[in-house]
Amino acid sequence: MARYTGPVTRKSRRLGTDLVGGDQSFEKRPYPPGQHGRARIKDSEYRQQLQEKQKARFTYGVMEKQFRRYYEEAVRHSGKTGEELLKILESRLDNVVYRAGLARTRRMARQLVSHGHFSVNGVHVNVPSYRVSQYDIIDVRDNSLNTVPFQIARETAGDRPIPSWLQVVGGRQRILIHQLPERAQIEVPLTEQLIVEYYSK
């Protein structure tokens, strides 16, 4: 399945949640697109579970096959499956770049990582799905620091709260991973138990 690259606002309206964060177009019309968008549709249990899974996929920009692999990995962990799934998604490098305020959206963060702007523990990494670990150090590469995206990030630092499990240091925009997040530290409008129920059928 190809990655969705269409209008994000339309997808947000279809799933009933702001997938970007601060999407003014969605806030103006938070109902599904199309002629009958305002019509009430009776939610079946399956539809609710599917919709929650799709919300998670599009929030983090993950394709179906990869999302299923994340779920299967979460099942093998000792904690609650839904919470473990969210921890895996949060530990992706593109999400960490977004959470640290170095990109306005996860889609932009994915592009920055893909274009080779970051190193992890001194090693160049250009894979958005790369999984960070506790005590990792993520740096913007020297030749990228003065490019427009990172200049904007420095100017807008503080506009969005940074989660307590990571820290951004000074003008170099270095990201320190103090720990991997607990569920209470993950602010996403998702009911992960519905995703577990979807895959448990």
From Swiss-Prot:
Residues 91-157 form the S4 RNA-binding domain. Residues 1-42 are annotated as: Disordered. GO terms for biological process: ribosomal small subunit biogenesis; translation. One of its GO terms (cellular component) is small ribosomal subunit. CDD domains: S4. It holds the Pfam family S4. One of its GO terms (molecular function) is structural constituent of ribosome. The keyword Cytoplasm does not apply. Keywords: Ribonucleoprotein, Ribosomal protein, RNA-binding, rRNA-binding. Belongs to the universal ribosomal protein uS4 family. One of the primary rRNA binding proteins, it binds directly to 16S rRNA where it nucleates assembly of the body of the 30S subunit. With S5 and S12 plays an important role in translational accuracy. Part of the 30S ribosomal subunit. Contacts protein S5. The interaction surface between S4 and S5 is involved in control of translational fidelity. This is Small ribosomal subunit protein uS4. The lineage of its organism: Bacteria, Bacillati, Actinomycetota, Actinomycetes, Mycobacteriales. The gene is rpsD.
